[in-house]
């Protein structure tokens, strides 16, 4: 039976000094011997998804203490991708995932904590904490800050649902007046919480439900709704129970690596494909699997993407549908329930709150439960009042959306599309694969041939798009923006948003070794692997080359002969794999350290150290 890790610092004559320091934090004689639970918070006033978390760590801490544990809170960093976007700040976003994972590992191992509650929300914070949980393999429960309410605005007599992406697209559209842009900007992000569509933050918080590491509703319950408080309260009690089950009863089924095994990762990826999650989730799922030693890779994602249909379309794929609508339709447990009916989910994986995922679905799927509590929970609605305060409203929908034929969440028999929401493409331009969010691609361009317009950076691409260098039928190629080449693998939301604003959203394609915001839609293909900086063929594309994209057949190819590609490769090897012209980019020592060990996107952009 494993001993509590914390005994290392709380027991024995030689630990008198450590106990003295513990006492200085408020611990008493009666606390030594209780499980010490790390409350891993990520409060910051920089990020709307985290601005309301300040007091929530202490809410969880009090519940831990009431359940018989000792709670010790600390904070991680949190980068807002939307604020960091469009300038060199975006170079820091993906590397911050590793800093977060490292900081959690450092704090938990340095102080010998027994278990942890991870309070996350936005783009790299949930993945960073997930990586840490898989590394540490101690009992862990995830509880996020929740999604923000969708913006609502009346424009020219019509009520429109808004989010962050609408503000960006409107700002670049010359046909929209300055006054309308201001109205959209002021209404797009009305409350605290993670941005309201199926963007990266919400996608990842939904996936923790499928992995079995968070409570039902974690991904969809609004940050402002009073129902969300229950998740924090329950997390505090639950983690003490999990710690006792492991350390006192030798129950390894409560450990992250047991819960999030390969079958659980397949469940999570199936959910991701069905709900049309952000392409960034592929990076983060691959990274978490790597950290936990789980044999799950691009070939598994490719296999699943060929059989899992798209059951839900949420902004940016469907602009009038947001996370509050997903919640009303039953949230993630409903999507998992529909997948389970189709034989596309493994019911036998463990969760932190039920014996198995199948048990959780039976209890929490609104189309099969008899629980009025569950039905009321999923009626939680937006309050419609701008606020930065958590749990500040208790509005409810009059009814639930259970329409499996035409509602927000569809059945396997009547999906939005038989093809899932994400796909892996292979070809001579991406031998190790690349990713496209098919849920956001118009059916008319699922097959696309176009001429390459090549840019050596996102900045150059933005300038070119706004300068009308790109026309209908083109394929924009943005390279040297991968994990090493950027460094940091910037998101390309501005180029895709500007293509939309120029009326080219359904007339062009974009391929990059960088990545995309969860807010991106259109024929946007990212994560081209190997990246240009590692000798990937995306670095061999030349202006005017024909590129052929075939999503139904999962291929992407540069229509150049093998002999010509070999000649270009030999020439590039002599020059070195770097942009043709120097870029005005401040690459600091911290970023260089990340780039030195970063792998390509097909490996999750994790750091791989030489043997």
UniProtKB/Swiss-Prot annotation:
Catalytic reactions of this protein: (2R)-2,3-dihydroxy-3-methylbutanoate = 3-methyl-2-oxobutanoate + H2O; (2R,3R)-2,3-dihydroxy-3-methylpentanoate = (S)-3-methyl-2-oxopentanoate + H2O
Binding note for cofactor: Binds 1 [2Fe-2S] cluster per subunit. This cluster acts as a Lewis acid cofactor.
Active site: 517 (proton acceptor)
Residues that, per the record, bind [2Fe-2S] cluster: 122, 195
Domain of life: Bacteria
Positions of modified residues (N6-carboxylysine): 124
Binding site for Mg(2+): 81, 123-124, 491
GO cellular component: cytosol
Subunit structure comment from the entry: Homodimer.
Role noted for this protein: Functions in the biosynthesis of branched-chain amino acids. Catalyzes the dehydration of (2R,3R)-2,3-dihydroxy-3-methylpentanoate (2,3-dihydroxy-3-methylvalerate) into 2-oxo-3-methylpentanoate (2-oxo-3-methylvalerate) and of (2R)-2,3-dihydroxy-3-methylbutanoate (2,3-dihydroxyisovalerate) into 2-oxo-3-methylbutanoate (2-oxoisovalerate), the penultimate precursor to L-isoleucine and L-valine, respectively.
Classification via PANTHER family: D-XYLONATE DEHYDRATASE, D-XYLONATE DEHYDRATASE YAGF-RELATED
Protein name as annotated: Dihydroxy-acid dehydratase
